[in-house]
Amino acid sequence: MNLRQQLTQLLSIAYVFTSAFVAWKALSIVANSHSPIVVVLSGSMEPAFQRGDILFLWNRDSQAKVGDVVVYEIKGKSIPIVHRVLREHHGKDKQFLLTKGDNNALDDLSLYARKQNYLNQKTDLVGTVKAYLPKVGYVTILLTENMYFRYALLGFMGLSALLSGE
């Protein structure tokens, strides 16, 4: 393979990654959420959502309602949590939410940050679930939990890139 073909292949790969990044950012802007797509990582929302389901979020609604399924993040923790709004309270121009997993016995008070009794809708919510695809996100779980699967996939992708003659 000559230099021109290698550069063309490199540009094609860069184009794919750039296109994916631009699509992600556009979706983030439209949904008004820094993470408009998340994967369910636990069984806390069964039977509504199963582990591995992909959730599509929307954060343009002014307020969440009791019964809505929301995704939130706790300060200092990087894993988003998918649970249903159990109660809501209103303060001065603020909405506070108490959440609970459908499959959990207790509300999420023990999951919140220290001295935090409710989620702040503006600062803690990533978005409200509007649609989902069942089991499609299970590949993400396999990639994070199984290092052999991750290395096999990376090896396959690298080998495919080397062997493709385009």
UniProtKB/Swiss-Prot annotation:
Residues spanning the membrane: 10-31
Gene: SEC11
Predominant location category: endoplasmic reticulum
Source organism, top-level taxon: Eukaryota
Enzyme class: hydrolase
Lumenal face of the membrane: 32-166
Family recorded in the similarity comment: Belongs to the peptidase S26B family.
PANTHER family assigned: SIGNAL PEPTIDASE COMPLEX CATALYTIC SUBUNIT SEC11
Residues of the active site: S44, H83, D108
Swiss-Prot/TrEMBL domain comment: The C-terminal short (CTS) helix is essential for catalytic activity. It may be accommodated as a transmembrane helix in the thinned membrane environment of the complex, similarly to the signal peptide in the complex substrates.
PROSITE patterns, A to Z: SPASE_I_1, SPASE_I_3
GO BP of this protein: protein targeting to ER; signal peptide processing
Keyword Lipoprotein on entry: no
Region (C-terminal short (CTS) helix): 152-163
Function as written in the Swiss-Prot or TrEMBL entry: Catalytic component of the signal peptidase complex (SPC) which catalyzes the cleavage of N-terminal signal sequences from nascent proteins as they are translocated into the lumen of the endoplasmic reticulum. Specifically cleaves N-terminal signal peptides that contain a hydrophobic alpha-helix (h-region) shorter than 18-20 amino acids.
Topology of this chain in the membrane: Single-pass type II membrane protein
E.C. designation(s): 3.4.21.89
The protein, known as: Signal peptidase complex catalytic subunit SEC11
One GO cellular component term noted in the UniProt record for this chain: signal peptidase complex
Catalytic activity: Cleavage of hydrophobic, N-terminal signal or leader sequences from secreted and periplasmic proteins
GO molecular function, one term: serine-type endopeptidase activity
Positions on the Cytoplasmic side per record topology: 1-9
Keywords associated with the record: Endoplasmic reticulum, Hydrolase, Membrane, Protease, Signal-anchor, Transmembrane, Transmembrane helix
Record InterPro entries: LexA/Signal_pep-like_sf, Pept_S26A_signal_pept_1_Ser-AS, Peptidase_S24_S26A/B/C, Peptidase_S26, Peptidase_S26B
Subcellular location, record wording: Endoplasmic reticulum membrane
